[in-house]
Amino acid sequence: HLHEFVVGKTSYSMPDPEMEIGRSKNENRFHLYEVAPRVRMSFMYVYDFGDNWEHVIKVEKILDADERYQGYPVCLEGEKACPPDDCGGIYGYYDMMEVRSDPKHPEYEDVMEWLGDEFDPDVFDLEETNEVLKRIR
């Protein structure tokens, strides 16, 4: 999905020739320590321009380099599950969770089929998150 990082007034995103020229800087040419180098700095991450998931990311601590994690980011902790892609943004997700909690709801079977039996909105999977982050280069 399309996404962007917004640090101050500067936007960083994937290069896309169809997007407005000069709108964003190429995210592949920058490292996090260059654009958010200090503790307490914050920036926004917008994921999926259709659903428009906005995340405020705050640099809470800067750790010394660890040879085990060279070349990719590492998540140290988190809360709750990621909403599924293309669920209609925050309001669509809230609607899904409401349907999920009511087996008598007419859309219950469809929502459960989409989410799968394993989905638990209250569980954050740190190991899975870091496996995904490991693939980012």
Where are these regions (language model features)?
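Short linear regulatory motifs enriched in tryptophan with gly/pro/ser
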Residues: H1-R137
